[in-house]
Each structure stands twice: as C-alpha cells, then as structure tokens.
Amino acid sequence: MKTIIVFLSLLVLATKFGDAKEGVNQKQKKEVTQNEFREEYLNEMAAMSLVQQLEAIERALFENEAGRNSRQKRCNGENVPCGPNHSTCCSGLSCEETFGYGWWYASPYCVKPSKG
C-alpha cells in the first residue's frame, strides 16, 4: 500500500512539472523549426542563385557555339560509300569506283588515292 502511494505521488509530481516544462519545450520547438526553415530557405535561395548562374554560363556558351558554327562536318572514312547521295570523303581519301565494292553495290567508295 505504501509503494502504491509513493508511485501515485511520483506520477502526480511528474505530471505537474511535466506540464510546467511543456510551455518551455513548445517555445524551443518553435525556435528550432523557425531556424530550420530559415536555414532551408537560405540554402534553397543559394541553390537557386547557383542554378541561375550556371544557366547564364550555359546560355553564353551555346550562343557562342551557334554563332561561330564550330561543329565540323562529318566525312566518310575508308571503304565507305560516297557519291551524290552520301557525304564527302575525309581528307586523304578520294571517291572512286573500285573493283571490290563498286561492281557489287553499284556505288563509288572512299579509298586512298592510287599512286600512279
């Protein structure tokens, strides 16, 4: 019986002082959440600023590339069909009718020019 009274009194004291600290805990929770949201907001703003800077750099690079037309035209390598319907042969190769391919596929091929 004495132990039950002791436990009940502890329960009442814990409840009373727990409620007293609950207001303080709520204030602390509000401060923590406000700080977290503020930090998240600042981090988000920094990330957005970084994204905008990267987009500006990318836009400038693509404008320069489009303006100067820096992409090389593709060319055909050795033993690749060439002619009016195909792209041109790479440097060092010429578009010729060859015995090995031309008679079978009926189109000229890019080959190394013959020395002679």
UniProtKB/Swiss-Prot annotation:
Database matches in InterPro entries: Toxin_22
Keyword Disulfide bond: yes
Endpoints of the signal sequence: 1-20
Propeptide cleavage-removed residue intervals: 21-74
Tissue localization of expression: Expressed by the venom gland.
Subcellular location: Secreted
GO cellular component: extracellular region
Keyword annotations from UniProtKB, A to Z: Cleavage on pair of basic residues, Disulfide bond, Ion channel impairing toxin, Knottin, Secreted, Signal, Toxin
Pfam families, A to Z: Toxin_22
S-S bonds: 75-90, 82-95, 89-110
Keyword Disulfide bond: yes
Domain of life: Eukaryota
Main location: secreted
One GO MF term attached to the UniProt entry: toxin activity
Entry text on domains: The presence of a 'disulfide through disulfide knot' structurally defines this protein as a knottin.
Function (record text): Ion channel inhibitor.
Family: Belongs to the neurotoxin 14 (magi-1) family. 06 (ICK-Trit) subfamily.
Record protein name field: U16-barytoxin-Tl1b
Natural source organism: Trittame loki
